[in-house]
Amino acid sequence: MKSGILPIRRALISVSEKSNLKDLASFLEGRGVEIVSTGGTASYLKKEGLKVKEVSDLTGFPEILNGRVKTLHPKVHAPILFDRDDPVSAKELKKMGSKAIDLIVVNLYPFETIFKSKAPRKDMIENIDIGGVALMRAAAKNFE
């Protein structure tokens, strides 16, 4: 973004390791940041008393395939990937009925830990993170 530091208005949080998450989310909420989150993370934050919008409310589509598909949706990735300096991109995002996602908080499934524990192959496969990697790549692509 050419105009300087981007104000953070909306954050997407999707984490498997939740250490210190309450503190971070409370900090963001205290500064007026809207928090959008995936199922397990949203449940955790709500239990901690924070206001959270679930990703499925954002997309209008539930998490599917036992949680394998949560954030792989245009209404999640477009607000991260759109070119903030391009009025056409901003207009297209608005036409979708969406708003920018300014901050991504992600950590990946603990594949290495599961692998080292010699867990069953099925457990290892379930701990290959797809959506988290896609979110990080989308955020990196639009970082300036």
Regions found by a protein language model. Give the residues of each.
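A generic local secondary-structure boundary/capping motif
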Residues: 1-2, 66-70, 90-96, 124-127, ...
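N-terminal glycine-/serine-/threonine-rich phosphate-binding loop
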Residues: 1-37, 41-58
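Internal alpha/beta core interface subdomains
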Residues: 6-9, 98-144
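Short, flexible loop segments at the rims of nucleotide/cofactor-binding pockets, characterized by
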Residues: 11-14, 80-82, 124-126
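Helix N-cap/beta->alpha junction signal
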Residues: 17, 38-39, 84-86, 132
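Short glycine/serine/threonine-rich phosphate/pyrophosphate-binding segments
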Residues: 20-21, 88, 133-138
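Glycine-rich nucleotide/cofactor/substrate-binding loop typically near the N-terminus or early
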Residues: 40-111
